[in-house]
């Protein structure tokens, strides 16, 4: 990867005008912050966020992945085991906590094994924010910014260092998720095309809209460049799933991404060894299984990349 990025830089040096080989944002283009979220577990939220972060880094973008989920599955897949590698005050909580133990965000950012991809790992400590915030809200005398602005303010010092930030949000609508939503420029909602999952998503969206309205009235930012629904774990031969996807498209229109993420044993088997499809050896699967999964994943991530580029005015 280092050699590939060096080659991209060399080719761009000989190109006049707009950069062609290095896709990094210009000074006039704002940092893209994507919140990947859903209220219901099993929607492939973490799988989506992790593969998207790796894809963008492989494409040459400077990416920061932020694990906001106490389960810390994204951290584990990116080489940081929460039980052994992540200590106290080494998560995003360390940079947004309310007391005098708060640290600068640069102290919790780590490199991953992939050039261009950094991570703020997670572990159970991040849930402390959910317990601290009600106490602060009740204590009118305690100084500090409101909860919904803390992640955005923490990221501000490193905004110029990255092109894209990706939040893997917890599967709950708490204070941490709301803070991530206020820091975000875009929202990606993963949904499994089953009736119960879509019903759960509907309730989640209704609750989110109500809470964001309150946050907006209090001064929080809720303006987004784009909002998309990604169909995950999709089985093309499943009739009811196809009907549900059709229903979603009739309800949400073009906000539903054109490309679904296919259900594949290649993705789930790679997860057994805490790897992504971009890391696992093709020889470990039948060629058809691996190729179909990779083609689906690349199509999804390429479509999301186009949304990012559109927000920058490039498409």
Please report, for each region that a protein language model flagged, where it lies by residue.
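P-loop NTP-binding core
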Residues: 1-315
């Amino acid at each position: 990867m280092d050699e590939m990025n060096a080659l991209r830089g060399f080719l761009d040096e000989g190109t006049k005008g707009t950069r062609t080989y290095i896709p990094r944002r210009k000074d006039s283009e704002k940092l893209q912050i994507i919140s990947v979220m859903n209220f219901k577990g099993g929607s492939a939220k973490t799988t989506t966020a992790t593969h998207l972060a790796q894809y963008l880094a492989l494409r040459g973008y400077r990416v920061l992945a932020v694990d906001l989920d106490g389960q810390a599955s994204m951290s584990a897949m990116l080489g940081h085991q929460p039980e052994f590698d992540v200590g106290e005050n080494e998560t995003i909580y360390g940079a947004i906590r309310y007391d005098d133990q708060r640290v600068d965000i640069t102290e919790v950012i780590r490199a991953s094994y992939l050039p261009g991809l950094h991570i703020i790992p997670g572990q159970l400590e991040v849930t402390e924010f959910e317990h601290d915030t009600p106490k602060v809200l009740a204590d009118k005398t305690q100084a500090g910014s409101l909860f919904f602005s803390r992640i955005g303010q923490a990221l501000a010092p490193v905004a110029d260092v990255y092109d894209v930030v990706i939040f893997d949000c917890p599967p709950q609508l708490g204070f941490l998720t709301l803070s991530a939503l206020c820091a975000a420029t875009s929202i990606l909602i993963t949904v499994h095309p089953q009736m119960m999952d879509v019903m759960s998503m509907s309730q989640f969206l209704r609750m989110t809209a109500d809470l964001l309205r309150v946050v907006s009235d209090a001064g929080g930012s809720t303006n987004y460049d784009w909002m998309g629904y990604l169909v995950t774990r999709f089985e093309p031969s499943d009739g009811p799933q196809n009907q549900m996807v059709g229903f979603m498209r009739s309800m949400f229109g073009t906000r539903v991404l054109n490309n679904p993420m296919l259900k594949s044993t290649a993705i789930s088997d790679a997860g057994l060894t805490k790897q992504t499809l971009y890391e696992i050896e093709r020889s470990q699967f039948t060629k058809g299984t691996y190729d179909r999964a990779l083609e689906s994943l690349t199509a999804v991530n390429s479509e999301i990349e186009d949304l990012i580029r559109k927000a920058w005015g490039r498409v």
